[in-house]
């Protein structure tokens, strides 16, 4: 991270904190003696100190990231799942589009809800409509 941060130029460098497919039980299995939020914050602090611009983190931890690190940390949130059709998949720490932005995400990453939709275009357009409604002035 430090080498990337030092040589990044105009490129934004992001670092993964904790995968959205992991929860506290998984961290215990991996030997981490802390909760998810503590690990996310610890890794985010290290990422910023190494020159990264932001982190990839569940929207569940975004409020803590913004609360502790402020606007200097860019938060990119994967694991976006629609409220009306939240599937049971391998993602354990998910939020919907509105929750992600309300919690402080700067950007979202949406994969399966679009890719696996019966009508991917309609799914993408519905997400765009939600985002437009959140940010309309």
Report the location of each language-model feature.
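Glycine-rich phosphate-binding active-site loops on the catalytic face of alpha/beta enzymes
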Residues: 82-83, 90-123
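C-terminal helical cap(s) of enzyme catalytic domains, especially alpha/beta-barrels
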Residues: 1-3, 101, 114-137
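Glycine-rich loops and low-complexity Gly/Arg-rich segments
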Residues: 37-42, 80-81, 99-103, 132-135
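Generic hydrophobic/aromatic pocket-lining and core-packing "Φ" positions
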Residues: 44, 62, 97-98, 124
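Conserved, mostly hydrophobic/aromatic
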Residues: 47, 65, 100, 111, ...
């Amino acid at each position: 991270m430090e080498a990337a941060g030092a040589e990044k130029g105009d490129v934004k460098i992001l670092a993964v904190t904790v995968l959205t497919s992991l929860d506290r039980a998984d961290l215990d299995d991996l030997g981490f003696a802390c909760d998810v939020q503590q690990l996310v914050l610890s890794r985010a602090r290290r990422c910023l100190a190494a020159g990264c611009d932001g982190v990839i983190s569940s929207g569940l931890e975004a409020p803590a990231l913004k609360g502790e690190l402020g606007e200097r940390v860019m938060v990119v949130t994967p694991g976006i799942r629609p409220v009306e059709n939240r599937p049971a998949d391998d993602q354990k720490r998910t939020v919907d589009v509105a929750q992600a932005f309300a919690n402080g995400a700067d950007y979202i990453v949406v994969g399966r809800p679009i890719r696996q939709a019966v009508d991917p275009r309609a799914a993408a357009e519905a997400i765009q409509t939600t985002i437009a409604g959140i940010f309309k002035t």
